[in-house]
Amino acid sequence: IGKELAGYQFRIQVSPLDCTGCGNCADVCPAKTKALVLKPLESQEVEMPRWEYMDKKVGYKQVVEPNNVKNSQFVQPLFEFSGACAGCGETPYIKLITQLFGERMMVANATGCSSIYGASAPSTPYCTNYKTGRGPAWANSLFEDNAEFGFGMAEGANRLRERVKRLLEENMSAFSAAVQAAATAWIAGFDDKDQTLALSDALLAALEKETAPVA
C-alpha cells in the first residue's frame, strides 16, 4: 500500500447488517479476481464479530496526509450508514468530503434527498472523529434560501472566532507565559487551515491550566 505505510495492512471490513446490497463495490472493483463478492446475508454472519473487533479494537490509523485520492481513503469517514437508497450516487461524494474536511466542516443542506437521509431523527449519518471528537456541523432550511442560510452559518462562525481573537488580544497581558505563547501562535495562524486545529488544541490545553481570573 506504499512506502509511507510500511508496517501497516489495509482491510475493507464490511458490516453485514449495514450493507444495502446495491452491488456497486463489487461492480467497480478493478481486480481480475474480485476482492468483494456479493453473498447471501446468512453466509456472512461470521463477519459481524469481525466488524465489531475492527471498529472497537483496530480503527483508523491516519499516518499520512489526505493529499491524494489513495491517502484520503485511509482517513476516518465522518459520514456513515445513511438511510439513502441502495447505490445512491450522492453518498460517496459526501463521505469523501468528510474525509478531506470533516473536522472543520459546516453543511448548509439544501432541501432534497440529502436533507432527508442527512437528518432522519433521531439518528444522523454524520459522526465525529474517534480521537478528537470533532465532526461536521449540519443544518437545513426548508425555505429555499440555502445560499443565504449557508452564508449566515459561515458569518456566525467567523464572528465568534473574531470575538475570541479580540478577547485574547485585549487580555494578553493578564495571562501566564504559557497562555500568551499559545494565544500568540493561534492568532498568528488564525487563517491557516492546516494548522488551526492543532493550535486551537494547544490554546485550550493552556487555558485549562490557567489560574488568571480573566481565563
Protein language model features and the residues they cover:
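Short acidic, glycine/serine/threonine-rich loops at helix termini
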Residues: 1, 24, 41, 47-51, ...
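Iron-sulfur cluster-binding cysteine motifs and their immediate structural context
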Residues: 1, 15, 24-43, 68, ...
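Ferredoxin-like iron-sulfur electron-transfer modules
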Residues: 1-21, 38-45, 72-82, 213-215
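General beta-strand structural signal in soluble alpha/beta enzymes
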Residues: 38, 107-110
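Active-site-adjacent bridging/hinge elements
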Residues: 63-76, 195-215
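Thiamine diphosphate
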Residues: 91-96, 106, 116-120, 125, ...
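Mobile "lid/hinge" segments at catalytic clefts and subdomain interfaces of large enzymes
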Residues: 119-158
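N-terminal leader/propeptide and maturation segments of large enzyme subunits in energy/redox metabolism
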Residues: 142-211
